[in-house]
Each structure stands twice: as C-alpha cells, then as structure tokens.
C-alpha cells in the first residue's frame, strides 16, 4: 500500500510539473504573438502640430512642432531612449538616408522625451540631424505604449538585441526606456502624415525603403505647390 501511495504521489507531481511546463510554453508562445501588445492609436496632424518642443543647447527656446514640417515636410524619429543601443542602431540606419533626403529637400529630425546629462550629446554621433525635446511626450501618444517584462520573452526582441550587438552598437541604462517610440514622415503644410511607424517591441525599426518612398511624396507635393 505504501509503494502504491508513493507511486500516486510521484505521478501527481509529474502531472503538475508537465502541466506547469506546458502552461509556461503556451505563455511564451502567446507572448510572441501581438495579442498582449499595447494597442496603437494613430496620431493626427492636428494633434502633433501643436506639440510644444524645445531646442537642446545653451539657449533653449520653445516652438510649435509644426514649424519642423510646415514648409518642406520632415522625417521625424521619436527616440525611445537616447542611451539605448537599439535606438542608436536605428538612428544610424536612418541617417544613411540623409544624402537622399537632402536631395529631396526634406529635413531629418529626432525627438526625445527627456534630456538627462549628456545623453543627447552622446546620441548625436549616431544621428545626422537636429534633436529636440518633447517634454510632454506628445510624439509618443496619443496613447503611450509601454513594453515591460513581456520584452524579455519575445523572440523578436532577442533577435534585435543580437543584430545590434553584432553591429557593434553599445549603450547604457540611463533614462526612461519603457515607453515605445516610432517614426513619422509628415508632409508640408496640411498634406498630413504620410507614414507612421509605431515601435511594437524593443528594436522594431521602420522600413527605410518605406520612409524614403514617403519622403518622395513630400517632394512631389512641394513641387506641385510651387507651380
């Protein structure tokens, strides 16, 4: 009878272990779908253009965000965290478009939500454009999205980590890095938002071909307006 009880207990423990393992595997698989990702609310031109931005430097000044794109349109990166090596990788890749954007007459900008120490200064070598402060985080809304522990079990995040590490990018942990960033291509005047990419997980970059294609639409619209 004693042996039978031991066997039943052992079988019960095995069943619990297998069940727990199965639940963990199912949880990881589910976490790698988009089911648990923060929902995205698209920004509108009216929402973005009244955003108050600040220059970063010795004599900071405030201005409305629409000044960035009103005449020539703009490509704008909303940086999750300047010290993040994934953000530095994305900024470096985006900067490769600078010669083509210059030919189109489209400026390249970056937005940060905080200015801590020398973080923006250390970010600047990776980004070939001006950087401005959005202290209220408007460019990260209207509905700010966060990624927390979920990021540690997503395969895509680890693949992004590996890609950036192999690329030789380094970073630090200074500042807030859970609110996800994004990318905008905004047309001149009231042309509107031509491309909006919202980072769905750490290191989820905008497609550079799509960014350049959207920027080319600004050039055509500007030419039509001049005529």
UniProtKB/Swiss-Prot annotation:
Cellular component annotations (GO), alphabetically ordered: cytoplasm
Region annotated Thioredoxin fold, chain positions: 13-111
A Pfam cross-reference name: AhpC-TSA_2
Keywords recorded for this protein, A-Z: Antioxidant, Cytoplasm, Redox-active center
CDD domains: PRX_like2
Annotated active site: 84, 87
Predominant location: cytoplasm
Signal peptide: none
GO molecular function: antioxidant activity
Compartments it resides in: Cytoplasm
Family stated for the protein in its record: Belongs to the peroxiredoxin-like PRXL2 family. PRXL2A subfamily.
Function: Involved in redox regulation of the cell. Acts as an antioxidant.
Additional free-text comment from the UniProt record: The active site cysteines correspond to the redox-active cysteines of peroxiredoxins.
UniProt-recorded name of the protein: Peroxiredoxin-like 2A
Taxonomic source organism: Xenopus laevis (African clawed frog)
């Amino acid at each position: 009878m004693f042996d039978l009880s031991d066997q039943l207990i052992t079988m019960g423990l095995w069943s619990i272990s297998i069940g727990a393992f199965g639940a963990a595997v199912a949880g990881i698989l589910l976490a790698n779908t988009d089911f648990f990702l923060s929902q995205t609310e698209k920004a509108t031109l009216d929402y973005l253009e009244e955003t108050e931005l600040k220059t970063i430097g010795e004599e900071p000044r405030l201005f409305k965000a629409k000044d960035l794109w009103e005449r020539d349109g703009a490509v704008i990166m909303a940086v999750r965290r300047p010290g993040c090596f994934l953000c530095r990788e994305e900024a470096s890749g985006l900067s490769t478009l600078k010669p083509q954007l210059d030919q189109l007459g489209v400026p390249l900008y970056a937005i940060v939500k905080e200015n801590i120490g020398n973080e923006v200064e250390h970010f600047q070598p990776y980004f070939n454009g001006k950087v401005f402060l959005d202290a209220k985080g408007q460019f990260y809304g209207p509905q700010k999205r966060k990624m927390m522990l979920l990021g540690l079990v997503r395969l895509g995040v680890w693949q992004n980590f590996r890609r950036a590490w192999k690329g030789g990018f380094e970073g630090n942990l200074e500042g807030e890095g859970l609110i996800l960033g994004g990318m905008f291509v905004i047309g001149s005047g009231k042309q509107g938002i031509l491309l909006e990419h919202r980072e769905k997980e750490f290191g989820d970059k905008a497609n550079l071909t799509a960014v350049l294609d959207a920027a080319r639409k600004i050039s055509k619209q500007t030419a039509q307006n001049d005529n």
